[in-house]
């Protein structure tokens, strides 16, 4: 009866009174007989060397009085060496295996052999005989003794501890009147009535089972596992070529169930060629597997005239990684989830840090000029710096700037008034480049106002690649840390995942999503900046945040977007997203938004974001002649005062008792200054009132040039720029990058030089703009807008419609005149213009000839087509006359090019 199941066909060939198997001669010869002492076990490792199992403390208790060389078998006795390490009792001897004697966890620490030759067998037996039932509860020998009742008719002859398995083998002798099965049953009943609790785990008790097989006492590093590999081997008594019978699952269950709960029995696959045949028996607990291995290893079972010897070994159970397998088999679900988790982690960790840096950037928390130490030092040294630097150097420039700001005081007051009103619309300041729009708004209209964020679109649009665009935008708003390089890496990962799984992972972000993310974080930071006073006042109980922002427009932050629509064709996405974000800012009353642009067609772009709003707009023009003169004289006055300051020391050294007569150099310098001032009025009329041109003139005058020479060089430089950028540009560049042609640019230059201003619609109807042969310049209106964006011309509007076309800068008027006076350039450009007109007329002739050929192919000439044929013939004649005239003019121009240098 095994585990409650009666196995009739089996006969256990183990040891005990009824055992028929006896140790072989080699085994008996290999063991050492001790007088009055238990038998020991010896393991041979090779010729000339030996290893006693008791070399490991608590692992073996072989007692021997002989030396290793005398106790081991001879080197030629191979059969004896093969059987070393097995427990083979004699008649009336049996073995029990006690579990829960040692902790299993110690086997991973004390797996190595201990370097000692001590003999513990006699000591263990003495301790077993002397130990009491009431003391030494932590002593394993005491636990073994307490587990064996005194009334049990057995005599313990040997104790073999197994630290690795957490138990111990106990060999005993018994009388012929008892059997090992009865002794096992008595021990089990005794432990059930009086359980022995181990000290290391009081929730379990010591278990005991009879050893039915031939245990193998090895000291290999094979830690116990819950899975046993059961190999079905032929018995040793049979021949090597004999086969064994594979046990069924029912038989294995009957053998192993008594030792513990089984979770699974897995037989060897039928198509497997591995021999010997095997099966896997999985226990729920590891100690149950240890008990089964130590009790059943080497058990021989006979069935139907065949015998099978069981060979048991531990085997690591392959755990089913269901989560990992599901994860790897569903990448289309897992990868987007991972991307979402990564995005959530970024939002939770980095967004508060980035928001903090944006607030610090807007409020200027990290600026040196806002620190208390800097302000204290500036107050202490203000008198010295003002007296040395500003009194003689900056007063002239300040005077010129004051004249400039006085002319534009109305604009400054209007902008400041709009910033104090509640209006959910944009403030747009439009002016040509060099008109001082940025200085007007930031230095004057917003002077002394806190919480101003300036976003310059020029470096953002001109940045190389998406990473550069993101980095420049982040720098403009103070958004940090920013990992612009990570998007390139994420794009590569996304591409690899898409190539393998067929679906995008979502790790990479588009340029649009990254821009929106940065602007969204900036909006959150700006809202906190605008509500800073609201939180300090504790107004939360009275009004809400939105109501507070609507009622206090002076508390809102100000966003200045400079160079809006700079290179409109290159940064359309950036401009659209900034405009949408700015619209959200003004509509939610978070901040005022001021756009600074030099593009007169800004309303097309901004109207997409605020289609139902009227913008508050200001247009800046050139300075008047009087203000421009004051501005230049202000710079020159500062230079004169610097020179007078340098001459103070020389004047003091002179005789100060009487008035000193001026020298000839002073008289000549004074007369030169008067001549320059007389020339300045005419030069300013030529130069115009563009602020950048006036500063350029002032710098040249400071260097010692006369106004006439300075103006001449400025005009020459402007002419060279026009020739290089508009007239002599390569055709490939024009067709791929520009929407205008050199012929159209020359047409405007020639006409503006003679008429100063042109009617917009008249230019559109001219053959050069209406029928251009350049593919990229076929749209005349787009060509004019492109030339205006390039600042060659300026388009003025009247009641919202384009009216006139003028030179892009006042100095360009003089440059246009100078270009038309160059005979060679004029002949060359007119030749190109006439050639294009000739091509236009030739195309008209081709169209007329095609239609005439179609009409002539009719079988009968109806009377109704007579008028059409007459019209076409007249048009053909007119075009041919024009071509003839153009050919004569082109011949004359070619003659000029041949003669002139």
UniProtKB/Swiss-Prot annotation:
Top-level taxon: Eukaryota
Q: Where is the transit peptide?
A: 1-59
> Which positions, given as ranges, span the membrane?
333-353
Compartments, as annotated in UniProt: Mitochondrion inner membrane
GO cellular component assignments: mitochondrial inner membrane
Alphabetical GO biological process terms? mitochondrial genome maintenance; mRNA processing
Protein purpose: Plays a role in maintaining the mitochondrial genome and in controlling the mtDNA escape. Involved in the regulation of mtDNA nucleotide structure and number. May have a dispensable role in early maturation of pre-rRNA.
Name of the protein this chain belongs to: Mitochondrial escape protein 2
Please report the organism this UniProt entry assigns to the protein: Pyricularia oryzae (strain 70-15 / ATCC MYA-4617 / FGSC 8958) (Rice blast fungus)
